[in-house]
Amino acid sequence: GIPCGESCVFIPCITSVAGCSCKSKVCYRN
């Protein structure tokens, strides 16, 4: 539930390596 400061509209979350995932076009972690 914490925004990672990255959007995932056009590309996947680069921050996924830090545990972030795409939700509603924004990368979140927990």
Curated annotation (Swiss-Prot):
What the entry lists under PROSITE patterns is as follows: CYCLOTIDE (PS51052), CYCLOTIDE_BRACELET (PS60008)
Q: Which GO terms describe its biological process?
A: defense response; regulation of defense response to virus
Protein name from the UniProt record = Circulin-C
Give the signal peptide, or none.
none
Question: What does UniProt say about this protein's domains?
Answer: The presence of a 'disulfide through disulfide knot' structurally defines this protein as a knottin.
Keywords of this entry: Antiviral protein, Disulfide bond, Knottin, Plant defense
- State the post-translational modifications: This is a cyclic peptide.
Pfam families hit by this protein: Cyclotide
Q: What's the stated role of this polypeptide?
A: Probably participates in a plant defense mechanism. Inhibits the cytopathic effects of the human immunodeficiency virus.
Keyword field contains Transmembrane helix: no
Crosslinked positions for Cyclopeptide (Gly-Asn)? Answer: G1-N30
Q: InterPro entries, from UniProt?
A: Cyclotide (IPR005535), Cyclotide_bracelet_CS (IPR012323), Cyclotide_sf (IPR036146)
Provide the disulphide bond pattern: C4-C20, C8-C22, C13-C27
User: Domain of life here?
Assistant: Eukaryota
Similarity comment: Belongs to the cyclotide family. Bracelet subfamily.
